[in-house]
Regions:
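Intrinsically disordered, low-complexity regions
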Residues: 4-8
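Short, charged juxtamembrane terminal tails flanking transmembrane helices
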Residues: 1-3, 123-130
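Membrane-helix interface and helix-disruption motif detector
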Residues: 25-38, 92-100
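Small-residue-enriched transmembrane alpha-helices
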Residues: 9-22, 39-55, 63-87, 97, ...
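Membrane-helix interface/capping segments
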Residues: 55-65, 92, 125-128
Length: 130
């Protein structure tokens, strides 16, 4: 895969992973009454890990699980970022905008990306047999 595409996918994955972990994980840690820097550190670790996973997996065709995982992470992250930031940019006064990305577009993109990764793997496998 082209290096520019790999960089773009990795950056989008890092941004989406950071924000999702910060807000969803931060809400869980809020109940335990933990300092804010722990939420930031946890979100940064998850973002770097997800970006590294996408960077390595986007460069080589993998097996079934890596294809499903990469498709799910990349598509889910793009859908989450679109659903999270889209309403903020289009309707700044709406306070429920980010919830669209957290509860609807992110999980739906994750599921559809996993299915797309499985279909892509099956197509590659079928073409390799011919």
């Amino acid at each position: 895969m082209n290096s520019v595409v790999r960089v773009v996918l990795s950056v989008i994955t890092a941004v989406g992973g950071f924000y999702f972990t910060y807000w969803a994980g931060g809400a869980l840690l809020f109940a335990v009454d933990v300092n804010g820097w722990i939420e930031l550190a946890l979100a940064a670790v998850v973002a770097v890990g997800a970006a590294a996973f996408v960077w390595t997996r986007a460069g080589v065709p993998g097996g079934f699980l890596s294809s499903v995982g990469t498709g799910a992470i990349v598509t889910g992250t793009i859908a989450f970022v679109a659903g999270f930031f889209g309403p903020i940019l289009l309707m700044p006064g709406a306070n429920q905008g980010p919830l669209l990305g957290i509860f609807i577009t992110g999980p739906l993109g994750f599921l559809l990306g996993g299915i797309g990764g499985a279909v892509s793997w099956a197509r590659r496998r079928r073409q390799a047999r011919l």
